[in-house]
A protein has these predicted regions:
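C-terminal membrane-solvent junction of multi-pass transporters and transport-like membrane proteins
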Residues: 92-97, 342-354, 388-446
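Transmembrane helix-boundary motif of multi-pass solute transporters/channels
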Residues: 14-52, 239-245, 256-259, 263-264, ...
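Inter-helical loop and helix-membrane interface segments of multi-pass membrane transporters/permeases
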Residues: 4-8, 36-40, 70-95, 108-168, ...
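Loop-to-transmembrane helix boundary motifs in multi-pass membrane proteins
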Residues: 15-17, 149-150, 264-270, 309, ...
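Membrane-embedded translocation segments of transport machinery
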Residues: 2-6, 10, 172, 176-324, ...
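Helix-loop junctions at the membrane interface of multi-pass solute transporters
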Residues: 32-37, 159-166, 229-257, 261, ...
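Membrane-interface "cap" regions at the ends of multi-pass membrane proteins
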Residues: 1-31, 60-65, 69-91, 249-253, ...
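Helix-loop-helix connectors at the membrane interface of multi-pass transporters/channels
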Residues: 1-3, 77, 111-143, 246-251, ...
Length: 455
């Protein structure tokens, strides 16, 4: 438990919701969701995504929050407080801590890319560049080890400085401000995209149901993609959101709070597409997926756009907030784990964490240049690809399966205790009739995602 035996808590309900949503909202909301939606039939994919968000993402989110709120600690401490005597569920707490560290070993580098591009647009570095030159900027950045390491270290130090100021004075205060600014920025960017000449065509491609695209991909593939997206968008399974449950009060039920987090996460993901597709269609540029969408396709769009320097800077400021909100949220979990497992105070946990992650982030930052010969997943792969594979394909689904089994089986905490914690407070309740689904169907769905990710 907390070394001072006095658990910190959020200063407001809004703080909890915005910080938790900030943890869930990240780079994948922007560079994956819109493209997958367009690829798999537009509105058809969105409907399947929302269905599986309710069937899979929301239940596991309530489980992480319930374990945190009832156990009043980070993953390992919470498991130990709730597990039956003699059981070893708390061992998963070490995997949660390792998962958060591994995630930050590459996420800090990618967040640094966002800051780099924000300053490039702000200072006019893209002004007058041809499409080929604009595309080449990304490769030049990746090949520069000093630049890559510099921004990774800046993000790492900034994150621990924020968390070092405490839960309310640091994480909650900065998180609320940053998420509020993020939501304003995304609305401004959406409105601007709607004014572009090809906006209608882009919006139709993105949101209107298109059975030909869906059947062309195969309906089974559409459903599988929707399952994956709804599950991974919340970053469940490594205790990243569980820690915020431990800082909650019991005034409101967990299904209601989890639903609010899901709504914010989905809102940002959908809005990202409302920005990207009208812009790409207006300038006849095909939207890609992943880093190439953010760092090659969109800079080309902005350089062709009236006032592109401003709109590019605002977009990458939005991306900086989206990524950094995840960084500080996961850092808080790492700090809490270190405090509870090793008995450190917050200052020591921040100092050691900052030094450790600055070093542990080097393989990813140098994996595109000095250590580019290291290709752990085969030719053309990078250290980032390998680290992301371990987190996304192993630790997230595997950890979510552990949380689920802990909350619904008699060998763990048990369904009745889980639902009692879920339903404490005012708001929507978790009904008892979901028990068979949680015990016999949901584990199979998560296992399918886990196995599929390993194949």
């Amino acid at each position: 438990m907390d070394p001072q035996n006095q658990r910190e808590s959020f200063g407001s309900r809004l703080g909890f919701i915005l910080v938790s949503a900030g943890c869930a909202i990240g780079i994948g909301n922007v560079w994956r969701f819109p493209t997958v939606t367009g690829q798999y039939g537009g509105g058809i994919f969105v409907l399947f995504y929302l269905l599986f968000l309710v069937l899979m993402g929301l239940p596991v989110l309530t489980m992480e929050l319930a374990v945190g709120r009832a156990g009043r600690g980070a993953a390992r401490s919470a498991y130990k407080a709730l597990e039956p005597g003699g059981s070893k569920w708390h061992i998963h707490g070490w995997f949660c801590m390792a998962g958060c560290v591994l995630l930050m070993m590459y996420y800090t580098t990618v967040s640094g890319w966002m800051v780099d591009y924000f300053f490039r647009f702000l200072t006019g570095s893209f002004d007058g560049l041809t499409p080929e030159q604009a595309a080449g900027v990304f490769g030049e950045m990746l090949s520069n080890p000093v630049e890559m390491v510099f921004w990774m270290v800046v993000i790492t130090l900034a994150g621990f400085v924020v968390c070092g100021r405490g839960l309310q004075g640091g994480l909650e205060k900065v998180g609320k401000w940053m998420m509020s600014a993020l939501l304003v920025l995304i609305l401004v960017l959406v409105v601007h995209s709607f004014t572009l000449s090809g906006a209608g065509e882009g919006l139709a491609f993105y949101l209107l149901p298109d059975w030909s695209r869906a059947t062309g991909q195969g309906l089974g593939n559409v459903i599988t993609a929707a399952m994956n997206q709804s599950f991974f968008t919340l970053s469940l399974g490594i205790g990243a959101i569980e820690i915020f449950g431990s800082y909650m009060d019991r005034g409101f039920t967990l299904p209601g709070e989890a639903a609010r987090i899901c709504v914010l996460d989905t809102f940002v993901a959908v809005c990202a597409g409302l920005i990207i597709f009208p812009a790409c269609f207006s300038f006849g540029i095909s939207p890609d997926a992943g880093p190439s969408l953010i760092f090659i396709t969109l800079p080309n769009v902005f350089t062709n756009m009236a006032g592109g320097r401003l709109w590019g800077a605002l977009f990458f400021l939005f991306m900086t907030f989206a990524s950094f909100s995840t960084v500080i949220a996961v850092f808080e979990n790492i700090i809490a784990c270190a405090r509870e497992n090793f008995g450190w105070d917050r200052r020591r946990a921040c100092l050691v964490g900052a030094a450790a992650l600055a070093v542990l982030g080097l393989p990813c930052a140098l994996g595109y240049n000095v250590w580019s010969g290291i290709q752990p997943l085969g030719a053309g792969s990078t250290v980032l690809d390998f680290e992301d594979f371990l987190v996304s394909n192993v630790l997230l689904p595997g950890g979510s399966l552990v949380y689920l089994l802990f909350c619904v089986t008699k060998w763990g905490w048990g369904f009745d205790k889980y639902t009692a914690e879920c339903n404490t407070g005012s708001g929507p309740k978790m009904p008892q009739w979901v028990k068979p689904y949680f015990k016999y169907v949901l584990p199979v769905l998560i296992a399918v995602i886990l196995v599929q990710g390993l194949l």
